[in-house]
Amino acid sequence: MVLEMLNPMHFNITTMVPAAMPAATMPILLLTCLLLLIWNYEGTSSIPGPGYCMGIGPLISYARFLWMGIGSACNYYNKMYGEFIRVWICGEETLIISKSSSMFHVMKHSHYVSRFGSKPGLQCIGMHENGIIFNNNPALWKVVRPFFMKALTGPGLVQMVAICVGSIGRHLDKLEEVTTRSGCVDVLTLMRRIMLDTSNTLFLGIPMDESAIVVKIQGYFDAWQALLLKPNIFFKISWLYKKYEKSVKDLKDAIDILVEKKRRRISTAEKLEDHMDFATNLIFAEKRGDLTRENVNQCVLEMLIAAPDTMSVSVFFMLFLIAKHPSVEEAIMEEIQTVVGERDIRIDDIQKLKVVENFIYESMRYQPVVDLVMRKALEDDVIDGYPVKKGTNIILNIGRMHRLEFFPKPNEFTLENFAKNVPYRYFQPFGFGPRGCAGKYIAMVMMKVILVTLLRRFQVKALQGRSVENIQKKNDLSLHPDETSDLLEMIFTPRNSDTCLGQ
């Protein structure tokens, strides 16, 4: 009998199953599928967004983030489904929020201080439970944050003004180093060098090959952006990620050498009072056992890359906006002449530069660089009536919020948008609360110093009708110009002179 059943020539399928399926079978199967869909959708069905569809929805939404980039995908889903929606990233529920009341709730509460991202990706770039920017271990993050806050406020803020003025002057005096063959100025490289030089002088104080480090920082940022959301399987195929691994190693090795030089300088210094900067405080904490050597090196790396990575692009966009809006330039120049005159800018001038401040705010609103914030819920919560489970990923789409609420002309670049006081819940370029940007005050001061010092010496012009609106951009972890495209340089014309750089 057994042999007959195993022999296909003798096996009769009709003896094993009924000739016809019972009439109730099909409805039962359909009901089972429906119950599975409901079970998979349970708890999140009240939140708008793409459907689960037996796992197809999460795959499609994750693929869209990998394909479009984080920023572009967020804008796509908010436009498609609304200002509070649910998607999936790497199989994890993720909320994308561009509603001011919901953002305010997330930013102000301490159970949203954690970040999220691919663990092997963050390990590769050195940010997994390390540093401050994407450290997703709240306990360790709280240990290092005070070092950043101390360096970025108080005396450090005051010292930065003179240091930055000096750096700008030196770099403008050798502008030919960032001038193309056609005579145009590579503004991004110029800004990155100025900001790296200023940061190094203020926070580390070790001579470096500025141009080489700037290139390494860009490689590191490209790796960070590329690896942040990659699936685990990506890191099991070495040829896929080895170029990013090399870019990270290049910068980390360079920073390790600089920090080691700092250690030797401290050990031979007669008076430590002259060297009590950010890096010195970290090294002392390492000697006390509060930090590891890896912690120290990563914190120094993140402090040095912050301004060249994002602020340089912000100033780049600002200069293009000034070139397009001569009335704004005129108002800025009148204020500079009134407040600063012919001398260098000082710390007591900063609060008086209201037109410059409003221009910076409107530039960051209209053309943001960091237009999203990534968080993770550390406990169950309810946001604007929607249940949020512990472990849920959250992306705050700040750039979109700045164009949806409060401002009288949200889709135009105009200083009228800041003619009246703007409640801070509607304008959050740096975030706020326990995980707000530690460098927001020093960033504002540095941008004012750079704009005032540069515009006093040069008038800036874009090439061939180029403007912020028609520059090709990439919107992923942050919004950057596509540096593979042409015509990103500018014309610098010395004021009160007939000579011109770029013509």
Swiss-Prot record:
Cofactor entry: heme
Principal localisation: membrane
Assigned keywords, A-Z: Heme, Iron, Lipid metabolism, Membrane, Metal-binding, Monooxygenase, Oxidoreductase
Enzyme class name: oxidoreductase
One GO term of the biological process aspect: response to estradiol
Membrane topology: Peripheral membrane protein
Subcellular locations according to the entry: Membrane
Source species, domain of life: Eukaryota
GO molecular function: aromatase activity; heme binding; iron ion binding
EC number, UniProt record: 1.14.14.14
Catalyses which reaction(s): testosterone + 3 reduced [NADPH--hemoprotein reductase] + 3 O2 = 17beta-estradiol + formate + 3 oxidized [NADPH--hemoprotein reductase] + 4 H2O + 4 H(+); androst-4-ene-3,17-dione + 3 reduced [NADPH--hemoprotein reductase] + 3 O2 = estrone + formate + 3 oxidized [NADPH--hemoprotein reductase] + 4 H2O + 4 H(+)
InterPro entries assigned: Cyt_P450 (IPR001128), Cyt_P450_CS (IPR017972), Cyt_P450_E_grp-I (IPR002401), Cyt_P450_sf (IPR036396), Cytochrome_P450_Monoox (IPR050196)
PROSITE patterns: CYTOCHROME_P450
Binding-site list for heme: 437
Pfam name, any one: p450
GO cellular component: endoplasmic reticulum; membrane
Residue runs in coiled coils: none
Family the UniProt entry places it in: Belongs to the cytochrome P450 family.
Function: Catalyzes the formation of aromatic C18 estrogens from C19 androgens.
UniProt-recorded name of the protein: Aromatase
Organism of origin: Oryctolagus cuniculus (Rabbit)
Organismal lineage: Eukaryota, Metazoa, Chordata, Craniata, Vertebrata
